[in-house]
Amino acid sequence: MNDVITDVNPDSGLSILEGILTAAGFKDDPDCWERINISRGDERLFSFRIRPLDEQEVADLRRQCTRFLPNPNGAGYPRIEGEVNLVRLRSMKIYAATVPDDRALIWDSAEAQQRLGVMRGEDMIDCVLMAGEKDAVIERIDALSGYGARVFDTLKN
């Protein structure tokens, strides 16, 4: 076996520690972001940038969109998960993954919210994006967040 873990990654020249710290900064790294363009017909209406979400963010969003029910075994037991509001979950996922500067400019625009009659950024997403557009954005967020990514090489003997 010739593969030995060293203190330096030969591909990047980074030390192991530098590599770990670089990997940990994925949410704030513009190289990990992607621009989403919203167009109708031939006209580009607006664009915004999305970033990867970490697993805790995804779990928190799911919890916020889940209705919890009393445990049938009694009040002394933890509540159980009921129905997940998938429409709200998808909107909140887009909202959370939008880069903060773009979120403030687009989804949290007080004037746009007032004119569309909504109170929150997640509601703006429901008003502005069509179902298929939301689906496409969610796919990109999941891809940026590493879902479906191949993160290791398989060793063959």
Model-assigned labels for residue ranges:
Residues 31-43:
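Short acidic-hydrophobic surface loop/beta-edge motif
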Residues 2-7, 40-157:
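Short, surface-exposed, charged amphipathic helix/loop patches that serve as local interaction elements
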Residues 17, 21, 36-38, 112:
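Extended hydrophobic/Leu-rich segments
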Residues 1-30, 151-157:
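Low-complexity intrinsically disordered segments
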